[in-house]
């Protein structure tokens, strides 16, 4: 299991278009992907879950990935969120 704190670099945060791209990327992996903000967590492969967290640019989220392809998933998703 990998767990990382990531500062959101996307100008619009994780709103509809960016959240959809994140879900699309996350869905390519077999690993379990959770996104946490404060005390709340959401399935990283769920558009509604991500949108419910209301993630803005500059906020720090926790990305938790568990599975056999967790290393590749963490690298790609961390790069996506922080750019």
Regions found by a protein language model. Name each.
Residues 7-43, 48, 52-53, 68:
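Compact, glycine-rich, soluble single-domain proteins
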Residues 51-83:
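C-terminal structural segments of small proteins and small subunits
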